[in-house]
């Protein structure tokens, strides 16, 4: 059995879009990594959203935790190994050196357009 600490789970949601919806595509869908590795996750919007992009971490039985706001702005108390970049349609989330405690589901959310 593989320890869950060896895995970084990434959430990839696909929801059929109504006219005007912004569709977010995140990749990769799953990563198997070890502590110390650099992790990069990308998120692409179906249309430009400026810098209205947020990155979250969620662990089992816990609420999502905001890590990055406005594409690249760090959140107080979040370790500096977490960073984000990008604008418009293409965004990147990076964990510079993975730690065992980082095993979780990560996802992006756009905040430019609401249903």
From Swiss-Prot:
InterPro entries: Ig-like_dom, Ig-like_dom_sf, Ig-like_fold, Ig_sub, Ig_V-set, IgV_Light_Chain
Annotated localization: Secreted; Cell membrane
Major place of residence: secreted
Annotated PROSITE patterns: IG_LIKE
Span list, region Framework-1: 21-43
Disulfide bond residue pairs: 43-108
Region listing for Complementarity-determining-1, in residue ranges: 44-54
Region span, Complementarity-determining-3: 109-115
Region (Framework-3): 77-108
TM annotation in the entry: none
Complex formation: Immunoglobulins are composed of two identical heavy chains and two identical light chains; disulfide-linked.
Protein name: Probable non-functional immunoglobulin kappa variable 6D-41
Native source species: Homo sapiens (Human)
Gene label: IGKV6D-41
